[in-house]
């Protein structure tokens, strides 16, 4: 799956009191929406890893999104 990012994207994922907060600017949300739409076309078990080394802001919590059957 091709991971494309809109210019200037920022995305942060944090966990606070058991709640996951995903916050992003417009470019980040557009990037995520395109990637999630592409993931929806994959086979069950396909997944995307997001972390501070490939997409998220420094200090973010790793996020894995997976498609289920």
Q: Residue locations for each model-derived region?
A:
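Positively charged, low-complexity terminal tracts
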Residues: 1-69
